[in-house]
Amino acid sequence: MAAPAGCQLYLAAPAELPPDFAATLTAVLEAAEIACLRLPPRPGMAHLVRLAQGRGTAVVIEGDPDLAAALGADGVHLPDLKTYGAARDRLGADAIIGVSCDRSRHDAMEAGEAGADYVAFAADLELVRWWAELMLVPVVAELQSPDQAAEFAAAGAEFIALGEALWRDPAGAPAAVRNLAMLLR
């Protein structure tokens, strides 16, 4: 995936989903193309998985491969590499397995060598740039603000991830996603 033109949106749902989250998610998915949605590990979310997948959005579950399998999600987002092997065994070769690496080059290289489908870094521009220049495994830049998106896309991030800042945007999550998608074009 090339950047910045190939940079895609990756959304992390809030840890606590509000009662109207399905309606908000529907509006967000209609506002822009979302490559991936990360959901918190909660049972009873199969309807959200189906909703996102029905719009062509891959869904990963935070940290719980068994729940990901039970919900029919596309994969799992792991907090570190410790359970990567078990997750791959549980979900199979076709599942998406991403690994959070915070700001660690070493952890990211180990995740890439293990076969992770993507690595995720905290908002560290130089680290994202370094990874994108040297490695083939896609990088997700976990940002705190949509204002950082263009800079990280230009640095080579294949995916821009936003969480709470997007869902709590004063203009509303659909407007925030639409603006972010236009920024990344």
Residues covered by each model-derived region:
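Generic structural marker for isolated residues within well-ordered, non-membrane alpha-helices
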Residues: 25, 84, 128
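Alpha-helical membrane segments in multi-pass integral membrane proteins
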Residues: 128-129, 142
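Short beta-strand-loop elements within alpha/beta enzyme cores
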Residues: 118-122
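C-terminal binding/interaction regions
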Residues: 159
